[in-house]
Amino acid sequence: MADKYEPRLKTEYVSRIRGAMQEKFSYANVMMIPKLDKIVINMGVGEATADSKKPTIAAGDLAAIAGQKPVITKARNSIAGFKVREHMPIGAKVTLRGERMYEFLDRLINIALPRVRDFRGLNPKSFDGRGNFAMGIKEHIVFPEINYDKVDQMWGMDIIVCTTATSDDEARALLTEFNFPFRH
């Protein structure tokens, strides 16, 4: 029987990145070494007020990108200025953990981000103070799973990379080891 498949970045984390982090921060315990916890992808669909089918279409694209069925997000309260009613579908989100998380991260770093127009690197200040990194992508068509010819509308998305790191410096070092393209 063939060996169980393991994502490339997970193998790299176990074999190389953990050792590099241990060496850099000299942790007393192996369990103190930061690791990736989850990746949350959120798509807010502003046009949902005009057409209630838009969040469903966005969720289909998000499912193709993430490889997992997203949850349709609904408005918590009504905002008359934006023509939003309570419980109206306004977007989609998905939380990736485990192997799907590593697979998505690999595609994001090596395929999607280099395809972004005028990409000069990720902002190294986009950490939240607790070891989590957030970024936004303006066009979802940079992912190879999306067929450019079949897309009638482009949506942006927020991508939050959650780590077990306790500080921004640890998280920045971890993501740099994963070859995140931070600008200098």
UniProtKB/Swiss-Prot annotation:
Highest rank taxon of the organism: Bacteria
Pfam families cross-referenced by the UniProt entry: Ribosomal_L5, Ribosomal_L5_C
GO terms for biological process, alphabetical: translation
Alphabetical list of PROSITE patterns matching this protein: RIBOSOMAL_L5
Function: This is one of the proteins that bind and probably mediate the attachment of the 5S RNA into the large ribosomal subunit, where it forms part of the central protuberance. In the 70S ribosome it contacts protein S13 of the 30S subunit (bridge B1b), connecting the 2 subunits; this bridge is implicated in subunit movement. Contacts the P site tRNA; the 5S rRNA and some of its associated proteins might help stabilize positioning of ribosome-bound tRNAs.
Protein family according to the UniProt entry: Belongs to the universal ribosomal protein uL5 family.
The protein's name in its UniProt record: Large ribosomal subunit protein uL5
Native source organism of the sequence: Agrobacterium fabrum (strain C58 / ATCC 33970) (Agrobacterium tumefaciens (strain C58))
The organism's taxonomic lineage, starting at the top: Bacteria, Pseudomonadati, Pseudomonadota, Alphaproteobacteria, Hyphomicrobiales
